[in-house]
Amino acid sequence: MTDHALLLVNLGSPASTSVADVRRYLNQFLMDPYVIDLPWPVRRLLVSLILVKRPEQSAHAYGSIWWEEGSPLVVLTRRLQAAMVEHWPHGPVEIAMRYGQPALPEVLERLAAQGVRKVTLAPLYPQFADSTVTTVVELAKQTVSERGLPLQMRVLRPFYDHPDYIEALAASARPYLEQDYDHLLLSFHGLPERHLKKLDPTGNHDFQAADCCKDAGAEMRAVCYRGQCLATAKAFAQKMGIPDGKWSVSFQSRLGRAKWIEPYTEARLDELGKAGVKKLLVMCPAFVADCIETLEEIGMRGSEQFVEAGGRELVLVPCLNDHPEWVRVLADMCEKA
């Protein structure tokens, strides 16, 4: 075995559906300053308030989608890992989670102990955000530095508009899009608008604009999560030949009362149901593996909401998961990282 490892990193999951495990996971996740970007005392107070009721609610939600093998996100990421092995001849292929297990610092330490000296770090997030990509990269760097690990790292950059990534999305979604449907909703994970504003070098960018940062400079486009989501959606729609008016974009998973990027998925589901859309397809391209946000939030609660608003059927298009075309594309992008 050679000394160059591929490390696939995803968000993470509770160890089980117990309230205690969910509380422990939510505490680690929400206390990350890249997730809730408030001063520590304020963040600690806010998270403590959230943890009064949220763990029980989330435990129920996780229980509704939990598989016999465990968390869908972790199981699917392990399947991706297994498929990637034959495409990565340079050394071991491992997975790590930013929150929960297998923990990123421990995986890095284990790789170093095995004689690995180079790591290609692949945050499994197509679009850039501090709360996803940056927190993974910074924790990896901090771990290597503080523990004195003899590891050289290179990082897979966000690939939101990479033609091969768009092709993989198309290949995985095509069987669903070849069926009759009325509308396609591309629902991305949302972010507080302030997360984007603090990265705006101009200070005057309009994060509600329909084309967002399309005409902004390269510096802004590299960090504008909303603009990257819109670019993914547009490239996908063009690839599939979906006419304007038959697809739209929204942002899900809003937490708290702060202003998040819009339009909100909940509002869009109501609008589409009331507008006469009967069969709605929903894709979630911010996620490469199905998880609670896709399976429960959209596939269950979102479906109920859409039907209550007048729709007939919501069909959740699976994420890329371990689709063969995605495996090939990811391996190629990691090879060139």
Swiss-Prot record:
* Highest taxon, organism lineage: Bacteria
**So what EC number does this one have?**
4.98.1.1
GO-annotated biological processes? heme biosynthetic process
Positions the record marks as coiled coil are none
Q: Which Pfam families match?
A: Ferrochelatase (PF00762)
Q: Which UniProt keywords apply?
A: Cytoplasm, Heme biosynthesis, Iron, Lyase, Metal-binding, Porphyrin biosynthesis
Q: Which SUPFAM superfamilies match?
A: Chelatase
Q: Is-annotated flag, keyword Lyase?
A: yes
The entry's Fe cation-binding residues are H189, E293
Q: GO molecular function of the protein, one example?
A: metal ion binding
Alphabetical list of CDD domains matching this protein: Ferrochelatase_C, Ferrochelatase_N
Gene3D superfamilies in the cross-refs: 3.40.50.1400
Record's subcellular location: Cytoplasm
Q: Which reaction does it catalyse?
A: heme b + 2 H(+) = protoporphyrin IX + Fe(2+)
Lyase listed as a keyword? yes
Q: What is its main location?
A: cytoplasm
Concerning InterPro entries, the annotation shows: Ferrochelatase, Ferrochelatase_C, Ferrochelatase_N
Q: Which GO terms describe its cellular component?
A: cytoplasm
Which pathway or pathways does this protein act in? Porphyrin-containing compound metabolism; protoheme biosynthesis; protoheme from protoporphyrin-IX: step 1/1
Report the sequence similarity comment from the record. Belongs to the ferrochelatase family.
Known role: Catalyzes the ferrous insertion into protoporphyrin IX.
Alphabetized NCBIfam families for the sequence: hemH
What is the protein name for this chain? Answer: Ferrochelatase
Please tell me the species this chain comes from.
Pseudomonas putida (strain GB-1)
Q: What gene name is given for the protein in this entry?
A: hemH
